[in-house]
Amino acid sequence: MAPIKVGINGFGRIGRIVFRNAIEHPEVEIVAVNDPFIETKYAAYMLKYDSTHGIFNGEIKQEGNDLVINGKTVKFYTERDPAAIPWKETGADYVVESTGVFTTTDKAKAHLQGGAKKVIISAPSADAPMYVMVVNEKSYDGSADVISNASCTTNCLAPLAKVINDKFGIVEGLMTTVHSYTATQKTVHGPSAKDWRGGRTAAQNIIPSSTGAAKAVGKVIPELNGKLTDMSMRVPTTNVSVVDLTARIEKGASYDEIKQAIKEAAEGPLKGVLAYTEDDVVSTDMIGNPNSSIFDAKAGISLNNNFVKLVSWYDNEWGYSRRVLDLLAHVAKVDASK
């Protein structure tokens, strides 16, 4: 099967990391990028040099208004209106919508006017169907023009919750994500009318915040709808986050039995998305890890056989971006079979 031709709208953190991941993904070829706020020369610089993930492993050039990556031309556009991006002329059948702006079905559908066939939103969506790899992607039937890859935190939590719920049954649970700061936060204390705490200096504070990850898990695993709720703690690290899932389980099990169930899933049906480690890791050890969820066997605890705290790491940039491409490849295969 020839590589799937893909366009990226929005060349921010996720857009660029999706691009870097695509170089390693044999089923995907990025043929076009659109970003109205970046000129081509600067896009090449931003792709080449990354303070978190290092220097791009390959050749990047600029030819006219286009990028040339490892000898292949990537068209570069600066359209503000998604409907005006000429995806068709680039051959891009699928578009990764990573601006964080066009996250509803109606807004993201504008890409179809430019010739795209399907749009994958790299963020949660209020109304587009959400899919998480190894959790519910098999329910995709090809009918939706716009879908969502959910959030990075949902992609970490959902595989872990699936294993625990399938094996032991989750009665109820609380999830906290200890999350690296992101571009929406402030480098110095500044105005943030809708989120006063969020306006405080990102690199100086631990900031309580909200997240919709648990609610989204209820959408991709309907049996858990209403059983989980969550919060976030934004912390002064640039990348890598960690999920703390505290749950009451129906079928009693020792912590060792729970660890074994997760290990078997990570080495079996969930391999490549869920990982398992007994090493004494810290957050920077997870930079560039392509898994969505890396269960830390030594970090968890249990109070008794029905009450347990589970800890799982995730590179909220790299691992999430890899899943965007995996979902895209899955969607393309389903579409091709129709």
Curated annotation (Swiss-Prot):
EC category: oxidoreductase
InterPro entries in alphabetical order: GlycerAld/Erythrose_P_DH (IPR020831), GlycerAld_3-P_DH_AS (IPR020830), GlycerAld_3-P_DH_cat (IPR020829), GlycerAld_3-P_DH_NAD(P)-bd (IPR020828), Glyceraldehyde-3-P_DH_1 (IPR006424), NAD(P)-bd_dom_sf (IPR036291)
Pathways involved: Carbohydrate degradation; glycolysis; pyruvate from D-glyceraldehyde 3-phosphate: step 1/5
Catalytic activity: D-glyceraldehyde 3-phosphate + phosphate + NAD(+) = (2R)-3-phospho-glyceroyl phosphate + NADH + H(+)
GO cellular component: cytosol
Compartments where located: Cytoplasm
Binding-site positions, D-glyceraldehyde 3-phosphate: 151-153, 182, 211-212, 234
SMART domains membership: Gp_dh_N
Family designation: Belongs to the glyceraldehyde-3-phosphate dehydrogenase family.
The protein, known as: Glyceraldehyde-3-phosphate dehydrogenase
Originating species: Colletotrichum gloeosporioides
Gene responsible for this protein: GPDA
